[in-house]
Amino acid sequence: MMYGRAALALLALLLAGLTPADAGGPAWELWRHIPGVFDVVGPRSDGRLLVAGSGRLFLVDSAGTVVPFASGPGGYADDAGAEAYIAVSPGLHVAGSGCDFAPDDAFVLRLHQPYGVTRVAATGSAQPFAAVAGVESLNGIAFDTTGKFDHRLLVSGPVHGRTAIVAIDCRGRTQVITDAAPVLEGGLAVAPSGFGAFGGALVAPDELSGRIYAIDPDGNVRTVAESGLATGGDIGVESVGFVPPGFTRAGKLYYADRATANNPHPGTDSLLRIDAHTMTRQGLRDGDLLAATEGGATMIAVRCTATCSVTPIIGTPTTAHGEGHLLAVAGQPAAGPGAAPASLNLPAGVVVLFVVLVAIAIAAVAVLWRRR
């Protein structure tokens, strides 16, 4: 009898280590509440993230401290309620224009006439930066960090059922890359040079078809991958972002979850977060492209070498309503001592099989001991 009780106690201890997260794979953490949040970019040179929410900007440090940014006289307050996506300057040189983008300057889509971009200096002062003509609105923004677009700021906007991609230099001058790209919107990103045949291209998602596109500096458009995620307006793939070097050793991924009333995915007005180590167990590697849906925040990784492959990372949809960029930040370690222990993040089938085998083994041991 004593051995039977010991066997049951051992089984209970084993099961206690298998949390719901283990059975379902990686899951987003509701990290910080930010009213109206819809985008996150960065980090700035001081390590803080830049967050947009309901016509306002915020800075968030790695500890989760949220402070208003550019909220004083001459600061930024515009397009409340609209998805005025943002980009933060890494301080790169535009050779063709003989000038630089100042480090940590923020650039915000202007979603009223005249459509364009507002520059918010690192000190918090805001002023019009560029006007973008010929578009019906604007719906995407990203810096060329690789150089094939000469390190310019890239924006997207709908034009008669297609999409225009416009490059903006550090003097605010614009050049249309193409006005015939497929329908796309959301968090855009420029691929690093090692991303197979798509290195240096602008990568953009289309929630309606589920495709992920690459736009070259000459305006040519290619399909990177079929995401395999759910499709449809307010549902399909909305956001992309690349995994930087060192991320899988220590890093965190951020995504904006915007509260959206009367929607099947109502959101929470939270900045979502997930540790790198929970995704590496699913096969994530540095240099991969991450893509997430607007409805439910499910996510895949795309790896391109000679060919491209797609790996599911988060497969279970939630009530999250994702918007803006996916931001992977290297050098942010997982929770330390005192935090909840990390789960194994094993696939559900593996967990069930493991539990069954352990139960059989313990039962067999108990029977043998009773026969002695």
Residue ranges with predicted function:
Residues A23-S343:
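Sequence/structural signature of beta-propeller domains
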Residues A9-G17:
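Bacterial N-terminal signal peptides
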Residues M1-A7:
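Bacterial N-terminal signal peptides that target proteins for export
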Residues P341-V356:
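Juxtamembrane/start-of-transmembrane alpha-helix segments at the extracytoplasmic/lumenal side
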